Amino acid sequence: MGKRDRADRDKKKSRKRHYEDEEDDEEDAPGNDPQEAVPSAAGKQVDESGTKVDEYGAKDYRLQMPLKDDHTSRPLWVAPDGHIFLEAFSPVYKYAQDFLVAIAEPVCRPTHVHEYKLTAYSLYAAVSVGLQTSDITEYLRKLSKTGVPDGIMQFIKLCTVSYGKVKLVLKHNRYFVESSHPDVIQHLLQDPVIRECRLRNSEGEATELITETFTSKSAISKTAEGSGGPSTSRVTDPQGKSDIPMDLFDFYEQMDKDEEEEEETQTVSFEVKQEMIEELQKRCIHLEYPLLAEYDFRNDSVNPDINIDLKPTAVLRPYQEKSLRKMFGNGRARSGVIVLPCGAGKSLVGVTAACTVRKRCLVLGNSAVSVEQWKAQFKMWSTIDDSQICRFTSDAKDKPIGCSVAISTYSMLGHTTKRSWEAERVMEWLKTQEWGLMILDEVHTIPAKMFRRVLTIVQAHCKLGLTATLVREDDKIVDLNFLIGPKLYEANWMELQNNGYIAKVQCAEVWCPMSPEFYREYVAIKTKKRILLYTMNPNKFRACQFLIKFHERRNDKIIVFADNVFALKEYAIRLNKPYIYGPTSQGERMQILQNFKHNPKINTIFISKVGDTSFDLPEANVLIQISSHGGSRRQEAQRLGRVLRAKKGMVAEEYNAFFYSLVSQDTQEMAYSTKRQRFLVDQGYSFKVITKLAGMEEEDLAFSTKEEQQQLLQKVLAATDLDAEEEVVAGEFGSRSSQASRRFGTMSSMSGADDTVYMEYHSSRSKAPSKHVHPLFKRFRK
């Protein structure tokens, strides 16, 4: 018996392990497909084997990096491990910053010194927007205070030598592999797989190589406002120009001129079979020549132009214009990702891209609210007629006849179960269309399986990803490089804040001591109910109520965020405020949001995690967070974005928006809060710690007596373990609502006896006399 029991236990364990592995696979971000092809250079790291390390772990770079004589006038130094440090107070800061944003990933950008890191993907992005290997190495040498280490030079050459030399171009609805390097084309054609992909004529012979000369000019014309050099908050002192080494200044001017000039380029191309495109892309990646996707929309005569233009009132800000110039730099549309802070006008960038391409456009958001907002943005900024915009959500399915711009959600397109007849017809129409541009809003949220499904369902010539936070806790964000394209542009948050393009936010972490009764239970309980105890901490409730009262007296508009629905309802109902969460209908949501925007009596609303992204509330200037999703950096930044929109009529020098994160002291929440702040601290924000709110004792606040606090504690303890869990949003990516989850709990909880009380009732025996019953039926009486 013992052997059989052991075998059963082992079988159960292996089944459990297999199940957990499956769960982990589901959580994987883009790129968990084993067939995903990635160039081997993408996995390369900078070699720093020759670096000396002392007994304290400090690295000694003196022998590898001798200082230049005029090092004080040069703004950066490059470490042998690929990290680049930039002096933000240098006279040539603006030139160096523009260059570094193009070639490296920002790591941390506080006030005085910025840190960047060279990666294979950042160098791919640099090549994709037109920078040559020689440009990158030469300008890096000129900007550096020291000699650039040989390992860095080799790394740059390795990552840029082949990338960007071959392009997949769609012209007249035919696919061509194109390059300005004839030797590369000949090298590719020697490969048997690529020869198979090449189009052949009716006699079975390969079509001829096409040699042509074309003039490349940006599709986005530079405005007078945007032409004054790089956009920056730093104003260079004209007298400081003498401090700038001439070789630096001349070289930057030359690079700027090269970008502006119309260039004549001679290219060699061959036509390929459309059905072999995916095979061709994979093979080119294995040969270390990844294909850059470009769309020659001006010469696409097969897909009709749509009647859309920007309104004269739509004025692009310098950073928006710059991001679009990276996308349309050579007169064609490049696929890629643009990173702008929340509230910095990502929607206008998307609408302008659609107006530039002027082909059928598909926009994908992550909620029905974002669909409505994208429709409003198209109507606000462009001349498109309302009848040409078609929405496809669970609530609104517009007829697609004559539609030029379709707006939907990822979950609607990736839906695999049975659809209604009407939805099936719309899906068929979406699949048969050839889309010129696909705009992917909040592109960081998309897991691999769903993302691949969306990409295979609809055919689009150009893909533009928009996001504010290109971070994921699983570090799989880099796979977007080959699913969509490289990062084309990333803005500096502090720079936009200093220029008044986004609000100036005061970030604060408010420490709320746990009441003794709550803390005693918190220490004793080991289940998920601990989350409920530190969220429902009466001192946190009082701090929240005090901040709401304080800001309502200033006529501020306040959003309170809570991931936990039990806490959200308790707070909102007790404070008599409207709240929005998953089950709230679309009509009720829009009504609450409209009241919040326009009704002076509704100054505070409570929102669950459904409002993390795509809720456009420019009036809000105070955000209070009472519970959150663990240590998610992305969620913290997205929530801050709800109050980042520039405020009208406010002085830019003063703080005009406030972000409070309420944290229960001596609990797990403290550690989570520190983790969550990392992304914003790297962007240059600082968090002020408040241990005591001045004037809180004078206010008449809830839970001021021990009896009230005890009643609240009993209510929390009576709640189920399910109440302690975060909200699962229907249709949310990465949500595992359909899967089983493992929870700790008591036996009574598992038997459904959480709120059940055993009670006895003594009923009186004296009953009313029953009616006369026939003797025959008495036998069947129970």
UniProtKB/Swiss-Prot annotation:
Span of domain Helicase ATP-binding: 327-488
Any one GO biological process: nucleotide-excision repair
EC top class named in words: isomerase
Motif (Nuclear localization signal) on chain: 6-18
EC number(s) reported in the record: 5.6.2.4
Modification(s) after translation: Phosphorylation on Ser-751 by CK2 controls the 5'-excision activity of ERCC1-XPF endonuclease; phosphorylated protein inhibits the excision activity and thus NER. Dephosphorylation reactivates the 5'-excision step. Phosphorylation has no effect on transcription or the 3'-5' helicase activity.
Nucleotidyltransferase found in the keyword field: no
InterPro entries associated with the record: ATP-dep_DNA_Helicase (IPR050615), ERCC3_RAD25_C (IPR032438), Helicase/UvrB_N (IPR006935), Helicase_ATP-bd (IPR014001), Helicase_C-like (IPR001650), P-loop_NTPase (IPR027417), XPB/Ssl2 (IPR001161), XPB/Ssl2_N (IPR032830)
Name this protein carries in UniProt: General transcription and DNA repair factor IIH helicase/translocase subunit XPB
Name of encoding gene: ERCC3
Domain (Helicase C-terminal) ranges: 542-702
Region (Disordered): 1-51, 220-240
Subcellular location: Nucleus
